[in-house]
Amino acid sequence: MLQIQHIKKEYRTGTLVQKALDDVSLNLRDNEFVAILGPSGSGKTTLLNIIGGLDRYDSGDLIINGISTKKYKDRDWDSYRNHTIGFVFQSYNLIPHQTVLANVELALTISGVSKEVRRKKAIAALDKVGLGKQLHKRPNQMSGGQMQRVAIARALVNDPEILLADEPTGALDSDTSIQVMDLLQEVAKERLVVMVTHNPELAELYANRIVTLRDGVICSDTNPFEPDSETLLPPKHKNMGKSSMSFLTALSLSFNNLRTKKARTLLTSFAGSIGIIGIALILALSSGVNEYIQNMEEETLSEYPLQIQSTG
């Protein structure tokens, strides 16, 4: 269970203070589809970022499974994001030169999962979103809706407890939006899904709870949740492990990036070589000119020696 207690957040630019969230409190069930509605600047995305650990609150508390995050360090937030949260954004954020399967596997690669296990999990996640037969396509060979489904598969491959979606249908047409929303609704049967949207029709049709924000304050909540003593379980701290990528894995990904962009790599190398050679020639020419001038000065002075005579 996720509990947001009296969260406040301000953004400061010089003397200007923008209050994004003002004493926001919200209790979220383990399995529900929550839609956060509100106009631009109401604090929707800020709230989503705080839930996902992408932003820090100024005061209040975010309680995860009974554990306060007030004393969380950077490594705790990193582990929380990588193991508990799945992110789906309006922009798909897929790596264009990688296949669909490789894009989904990347989330597990960062978590240090072995190749065999991550391949199996990635295929299962893509099957779940209906893309099991398009594993080896690249993002530029897919439609917007398909790319968003790849992004959802990537978010689900780590089996997160919470899925956060920021305007997941913002760049899609109405028919494709319905497909994505159907998928998110299905996902919400097994975990908590929190979606930010400007579309009240989609929210009312698919979400089982709508929270409306305005000027950083919750105006309405269609299905509020107040945990009682029976609902509140003893605090449990989940050992989520450390997320890391080995040096060899990072080197392999970099090499694949260079290999798939051969023309750009060659042109960049050629341009860099010309630049280095040009600098070397300028330095050599400058050194040669200075040496020539010095030799000329010495020869001139030797031909016309200066004579100093004393008078008096």
Per-region residue spans from a language model:
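Helix-to-loop junction immediately C-terminal to a conserved catalytic motif
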Residues: G52
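Conserved ABC ATPase "signature" region
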Residues: I67-S68, E105, T109, E116-K133
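Conserved ABC ATPase signature
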Residues: S79, R138-Q148
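Conserved signature/switch motifs of ABC ATPase nucleotide-binding domains
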Residues: N82, K137-N140, V157-N158, K189
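Conserved catalytic loops of ABC-family nucleotide-binding domains
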Residues: H83, L183-M195
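Catalytic Walker B motif of ABC-type/P-loop ATPase nucleotide-binding domains
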Residues: L163-D166
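Alpha-helical transmembrane segments
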Residues: R264, I277-Q307
